[in-house]
Curated annotation (Swiss-Prot):
Positions where Phosphoserine occurs in the chain: S54, S105, S108, S150, S152
Record protein name field: Pro-glucagon
Domain of life: Eukaryota
Gene responsible for this protein: GCG
The species this protein was found in: Mesocricetus auratus (Golden hamster)
Subcellular localization: Secreted
Length: 180
């Protein structure tokens, strides 16, 4: 991207140089022809003023462009340093924005992972029936919110938790038979 801007800058400098060169050629040609008595003589100060004005306009526009480019580069640098300040290898979905514009919470992801590990360990050990208090789970599901304050789709969340609970209860209560 920077290479494109550098090439564009060189192109602008070349175009400006060709304009100046063509202006000088025009001035030399007009001076080589004798002026008639009826034509007013051009004031050399006026020509220099026009040339300085066009150069100043170009310089002003180019300076504004460079200032805006420096500001964009600075903002990009700030964003990159914020993302990489800890130099931690991140999964692709961490710190990315959801469709609603909310950020994934590292703490909740960690806690959910720990709960899943504990649940799998509990299933592997094959302990007895685990009771799930329905009222507490439903209240927790209704109270969950995204970071931006919008409610998640509560009905789907509740139905998913009920289906999961029924499936786990079915797994626990089903006797395992070995077919030989």
């Amino acid at each position: 991207m920077k290479n494109i801007y550098i090439v564009a800058g060189f192109f602008v400098v070349l175009v400006q140089g060709s304009w100046q060169h063509s202006l000088q050629d025009t001035e030399e040609k007009s001076r080589s022809f004798p002026a008639s008595q009826t034509d007013p003589l051009e004031d050399p100060d006026q020509i220099n003023e026009d040339k300085r004005h066009s150069q100043g306009t170009f310089t002003s526009d180019y300076s504004k462009y460079l200032d805006s480019r420096r500001a964009q580069d600075f903002v990009q640098w700030l964003m990159n340093t914020k993302r990489n300040r800890n130099n931690i290898a991140k999964r692709h979905d961490e710190f990315e924005r959801h469709a609603e514009g909310t950020f994934t919470s590292d703490v909740s992801s960690y806690l959910e992972g720990q709960a899943a590990k504990e649940f799998i360990a509990w299933l592997v050990k094959g302990r007895g029936r685990r009771d799930f208090p329905e009222e507490v789970t439903i209240v927790e599901e209704l109270g969950r919110r995204h970071a931006d304050g919008s409610f998640s789709d509560e009905m789907n969340t509740i139905l998913d938790s009920l289906a999961t609970r029924d499936f786990i209860n079915w797994l626990i209560q089903t006797k395992i038979t070995d077919k030989k």
